Amino acid sequence: MSFSGNDISNLNGLINANFEELEDLTFNTNIISDISVLGKLNFKNLKQLWLYNNIISDITPLGKANFEKLEVLSMHTNKITDISILEKANLISLTILNLDTNNISDITPLKNCKFKKLKILSLHSNKISDITPIQMANFKCLKVLNLNNNEITDISILNDKMFENLEKLNLSNNNIDEKKYEQIINKLKSDIKIFDI
């Protein structure tokens, strides 16, 4: 079900609707800032939630939402700074998380997220400098990691054990020293497609 490009400012219209069988919900390119209603609804079969290109800054309602079957969460191009609620969110089926083009600097909460099925993590165009939490996270199924256009300087934590299944790694447009970059990248398995700095 798509409500994209309609100048919608809130999700309150969903309150009395029956979405028990709904699998895909799209509210892209609107002017939504408040998603608190998501914590009050029963989306027990929802698999995809698209909320990109809005003005959302507070994602704490995700912590109360029933998203056990959610596979895709796309909230890029918003105003998100704090992702700490992801530690508590019930997103055990998540395979794609897209938080590109926000104002995120601290990704520490990722180390405690239970995203055991996560295949694509996209965080490009934020303000991230420390990627250590990704090393500490249990993302063994991760295939694509986009970290381009951030403020990363140190990638020494990158190793094959972190990325057993990684196929694509994008670190372009960061502040990484070229010599150190080459040393680290050369140690990673050769079949990873790497987008150069």
Per-region residue spans from a language model:
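Concave beta-strand-loop units of leucine-rich repeat
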Residues: 1-8, 21-32, 45-56, 69-79, ...
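A structural signal for leucine-rich repeat
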Residues: 12-19, 36-43, 59-67, 83-91, ...
